[in-house]
From Swiss-Prot:
Gene that this sequence comes from: rpsR
Role played: Binds as a heterodimer with protein bS6 to the central domain of the 16S rRNA, where it helps stabilize the platform of the 30S subunit.
Region (Disordered): 85-105
Protein species of origin: Mycoplasmopsis pulmonis (strain UAB CTIP) (Mycoplasma pulmonis)
UniProtKB keywords: Ribonucleoprotein, Ribosomal protein, RNA-binding, rRNA-binding
Protein's UniProt name: Small ribosomal subunit protein bS18
GO biological process: translation
């Protein structure tokens, strides 16, 4: 019975074809920012190989190149986020200030 299960497992496996293999890229250069940015998510993190379908060897090369590009300031460590803060509204409702203001009458 194990023999039949092994056959089913082999049939269901699909061959992984990565973007690097499709383009015929053998060497990953840290200066190629356009290529490296395809392997970074919106928060600036390196995408895992399960998502990118890159082999373990190529994933290590990618990681090394992305880290080098970050250290050389070619890639940001994190993506820019719009920081929103609540505006500081200073309202003075103290009775002393109301009395101190001269009336227009």
């Amino acid at each position: 019975m194990n023999h039949n299960k092994d056959k089913l497992k082999k049939k269901n496996k699909r061959k992984r074809v990565s973007f690097l293999d499709e383009q015929g890229i053998n060497y990953i250069d840290y200066k190629d920012v356009e290529l490296l940015s395809k392997f970074i998510n919106s928060h600036g993190k390196i995408l895992p190989s399960k998502i990118t379908d890159v082999s373990a060897k190529r994933q290590r090369m990618l990681t090394r190149a992305i880290k080098r590009a970050r250290n050389m300031a070619l890639l940001p460590f994190t993506q820019e986020r719009v920081r929103t803060q609540k505006p500081l509204i200073v309202t003075s409702n103290s009775p002393k200030e109301k009395e101190a203001k001269p009336s227009a009458q």
